[in-house]
Amino acid sequence: MTMQAQLGDKTFTLERFPLDQKNRSLQAWDSADEYLIDYVSEHHPDCRSLLILNDSFGALSCYFSHKQLTVCSVNDSYISHQAAAYNLAENKIPAITFSQLDSLSALPEQVDLVLIKVPRTLGFLQYQLSELSEVLAPGTPVIAAAKTKDVHNSTIKAFEQFIGETKTSLAVKKSRLIISHAQGGYKAADFPVNWPLEGTDFTISNHANVFSRDSLDIGARFFFNYLPETNKAKSIIDLGCGNGVVGLMALSRCPNANITFVDESYMAVESARLNVELNMEAKYEQCSFVENDCLSGFERDSVDMVLCNPPFHQAQAVTDHIAWQMFKEAKDTLKEGGELRIIGNRHLDYHDKLNRMFGNCKLLGSNKKFVVLSATKNTGML
């Protein structure tokens, strides 16, 4: 399908990342982006500096940078950062007044206007609004957008709590705006969250945008039963590490292994780093922490084992391309005889995917909801 996006008065070519994903029906912008652009053009034509939060693939960044505004884009996604930079370059938009920050960086204090694409996680929204409340001058407009089905009472209450008086717009193309103005005064959000990891002496620390932020998720709990308990694996990757509990437990059972924690979320990688530092400080030097698009750029044939709990969401879309990419790049990164060990929901049919890719797949365990699978890299079998 075409990737031509008519945004305001200009047509852009916008690509969704990763570029080689199989589902080309997913596009890099949505009606919420269009609504924000039209609203700002009509109601804030004199805006010169803009702070954008959660611009998934750079649609907003491209439009307002094209208009020669000073744009700072803040995101928790490494992939979103790559997409924005790529799309600006593809549309030949100079990035002279464009900058990007990760979700844990200090926000700029001098902006005319804030735009937010509402994230899936309420806790992450609360964290972002809290950070804004600390830096915005009173009266600064804050305008958010989301699909109408994703604007809940709790969403509105978060804006009222951290920013100020809030109203919503009429729906246009199934999207809605949330319009607020900073009232001044910092209002703290309780992040990171700390909780005890059951069955261990570990305390887990989670930043706001990390999955299952205040307890162990049931998938990881089941996966713990099938983690390696041998020093045979000298190098292990926790791929899509989240808060790092899987890699942390692997390190506790394989104390001589080098563990690499990889995620595309800056908050996830920082949570994993904190959790190793808090709970296994003596092993910290055996660990590395990497924000990345899966394992792209990793050395081929270099690791003994990859542990993975693949996600099946990207932004608001349900998709399996991330799992496919993880499996393919894990195979490339594994040494001959190396193992990919995963947990997944039963209905996702990962067994068939791994068989097709590796030429083998073994069921290690299952319950009503999950399966734990193992695939070994053996090029002679393919």
UniProtKB/Swiss-Prot annotation:
Belongs to the methyltransferase superfamily. RlmG family. GO terms for cellular component: cytoplasm. This is Ribosomal RNA large subunit methyltransferase G. CDD domains: AdoMet_MTases (cd02440). The lineage of its organism: Bacteria, Pseudomonadati, Pseudomonadota, Gammaproteobacteria, Alteromonadales. GO terms for molecular function: 23S rRNA (guanine(1835)-N(2))-methyltransferase activity; nucleic acid binding. Keywords: Cytoplasm, Methyltransferase, rRNA processing, S-adenosyl-L-methionine, Transferase. Specifically methylates the guanine in position 1835 (m2G1835) of 23S rRNA. The keyword Protease does not apply.
